[in-house]
C-alpha cells in the first residue's frame, strides 16, 4: 500500500477507468505530528510535518454537471456519480463525501465551479492509520478544483475549507492542524504552528544521524466514531469552568502554573486531567521547538516521551496497541524518544531512532508487539515532503 506513483502511471490508470485523457495530475501528502497532540482545537501549538505517503489524484474537466469519482483504494465501489447541484452528505457515497464537502464549501465561498469533472484517486496512506488520509484528500480536491476552474484561491483559505468540511460536513470536531500541515508543508521543514493565531514558522528538520520511524498498530480507527469529540467537549467544559476566574477563550492561553493555581474550578477529575494535558502539552511543544532549533535532539526525545505519558494517563487516548509500541520502543538501543501521533485510539506512533539501529529496532518492536497483540505492526521511514501540488 506504500507504492509511489508517477504522473505517467496516473495518466494510464485514469485512461483505463474513464476512457479519456487526463487534464492534470496531483499529489497531496499525509502528515505526522512530532509533538503537540490534541492541542490544535485547544488553541495551542503543534509541530507537524508533511510526509511522502499521501494521496495521488488525476482529473479531467467535463462538459456537463456531473462529478464522477473513482478510488483505486475502493475498487469495489466503482465509479460514483454525483450531480454537481446535489453536494450533500450521503453515507453510501463513502469516501466521496470528503471531496463533495470541499466542493460544496468552495461554492459557498463564492468560487465558480460550473462544470463537473472526472476524478481518479489513489492513496498510499494506510487507511485508518491516523496519518490524515481524509485531510490529504480534502486539500487535494481543493487544489484540483483550483487548477481545473482557475480559481483565485489562497492556500490558507483552502486549509480552512478543509477543516470546515471535516467539522460541518463529515461531523468530526477536529482542529486545523492536519489540513494546515498538508496544505502548507515544505521540504525538510517542520511547521511550528500557533493554532490560535495561525502564525507559523517553517523549522529546518535536521535530525543528524536519526530518522523518524512511523509504527502502525494496524488497528482500524474511525475518528468520527471514536471518543475524539468527547475529549473536545471535556476541554470546552473545562474552559467554561475556568472562565469564572480567568479571561481566557482556550486552554492554550494558560501555563502550567495557572492550571495548578485554578484547578479547583474544574469540578470533574477527568476534565481536570484533560485540561492539564492540553496546557502541559502546549508547553512541551514550545520547548521541543526550541530544542530542535538548538540541535538538542536528546531533549526533543525526552519531550516526546513525556507527551506520550500524558496522552496515556491524562488524556487517555492511547490503548493497548499504541502503548505496546511506544513502551517497547523506549527500551530499544538507539531510540531518543517515542510517542503516539495523531488522534490516538489506535493508528500510529513515531520513534526518533538512530539510522544504524533501525533494522534491529523494527525486528525487536515488531516481535514483541505481535506477541502481545496477536498480529504484526507495520513500519515506515517518514520522508518529509512538500505540500499539495501539481505533479505535471
UniProtKB/Swiss-Prot annotation:
It is found in: Cytoplasm. Its main location: cytoplasm. Its EC number is 2.7.1.6. One of its GO terms (molecular function) is galactokinase activity. The record marks 31 as: Transition state stabilizer. Pathway: Carbohydrate metabolism; galactose metabolism. ATP binds at residues 71, 128-134. It comes from the Bacteria. It catalyses: alpha-D-galactose + ATP = alpha-D-galactose 1-phosphate + ADP + H(+). InterPro entries: Galactokinase, Galactokinase_bac, Galactokinase_CS, GalKase_N, GHMP_kinase_C_dom, GHMP_kinase_C_sf, GHMP_kinase_N_dom, GHMP_knse_ATP-bd_CS. GO terms for cellular component: cytosol. It holds the Pfam family GHMP_kinases_N. The active site is at residue 178. Belongs to the GHMP kinase family. GalK subfamily. Catalyzes the transfer of the gamma-phosphate of ATP to D-galactose to form alpha-D-galactose-1-phosphate (Gal-1-P). This is Galactokinase. It comes from Streptococcus pneumoniae (strain ATCC BAA-255 / R6).
Amino acid at each position: 500500500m506504500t507504492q509511489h506513483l508517477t504522473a505517467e502511471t496516473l495518466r494510464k490508470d485514469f485512461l483505463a477507468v474513464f476512457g479519456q485523457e487526463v487534464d492534470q495530475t496531483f499529489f497531496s501528502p499525509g502528515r505526522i505530528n512530532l509533538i503537540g497532540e490534541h492541542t490544535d482545537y485547544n488553541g495551542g501549538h503543534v509541530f507537524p510535518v508533511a510526509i511522502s505517503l499521501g494521496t495521488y489524484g488525476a482529473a479531467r474537466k467535463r462538459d456537463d454537471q456531473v462529478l464522477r469519482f473513482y478510488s483505486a483504494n475502493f475498487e469495489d465501489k466503482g465509479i460514483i456519480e454525483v450531480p454537481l447541484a446535489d453536494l450533500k452528505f450521503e453515507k453510501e457515497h463513502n469516501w466521496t463525501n470528503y471531496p463533495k464537502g470541499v466542493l460544496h464549501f468552495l461554492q459557498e465561498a463564492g468560487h465558480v465551479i460550473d462544470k463537473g469533472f472526472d476524478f481518479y484517486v489513489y492513496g498510499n496512506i494506510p487507511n485508518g492509520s491516523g496519518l490524515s488520509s481524509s485531510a490529504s484528500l480534502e486539500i487535494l480536491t481543493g487544489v484540483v478544483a483550483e487548477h481545473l476552474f482557475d480559481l483565485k484561491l489562497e492556500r490558507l483559505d483552502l486549509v480552512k475549507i478543509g477543516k470546515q468540511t471535516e467539522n460541518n460536513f463529515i461531523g468530526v470536531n477536529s482542529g486545523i492542524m492536519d489540513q494546515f500541515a498538508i496544505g502548507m508543508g515544505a521540504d525538510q521543514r517542520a511547521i511550528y504552528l500557533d493554532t490560535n493565531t495561525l502564525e507559523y514558522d517553517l523549522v529546518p528538520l535536521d535530525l543528524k544521524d536519526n530518522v523518524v520511524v512511523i509504527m502502525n498498530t494496524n488497528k482500524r480507527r474511525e475518528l468520527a466514531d471514536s471518543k475524539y469529540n468527547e475529549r473536545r467537549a471535556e476541554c470546552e467544559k473545562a474552559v467554561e469552568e475556568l472562565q469564572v476566574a480567568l479571561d481566557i477563550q482556550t486552554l492554550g492561553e494558560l501555563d502550567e502554573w495557572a492550571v495548578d493555581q485554578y484547578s479547583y474550578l474544574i469540578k470533574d477529575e477527568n476534565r481536570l486531567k484533560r485540561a492539564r494535558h492540553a496546557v502541559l502539552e502546549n508547553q512541551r511543544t514550545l520547548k521541543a521547538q526550541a530544542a530542535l532549533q538548538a540541535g538538542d535532539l536528546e531533549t526533543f526525545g525526552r519531550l516526546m516521551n513525556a507527551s506520550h505519558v500524558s496522552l496515556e494517563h491524562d488524556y487517555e487516548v492511547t490503548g493497548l496497541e499504541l502503548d505496546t509500541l511506544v513502551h517497547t520502543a523506549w527500551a530499544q538501543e538507539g531510540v531518543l524518544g517515542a510517542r503516539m501521533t495523531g488522534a490516538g485510539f489506535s493508528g500510529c506512533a513515531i520513534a526518533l531512532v538512530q539510522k544504524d539501529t533501525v533494522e534491529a529496532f523494527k525486528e525487536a518492536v515488531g516481535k514483541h508487539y505481535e506477541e502481545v497483540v496477536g498480529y504484526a505492526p507495520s513500519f515506515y521511514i517518514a520522508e518529509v515532503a512538500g505540500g499539495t501540488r501539481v505533479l505535471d
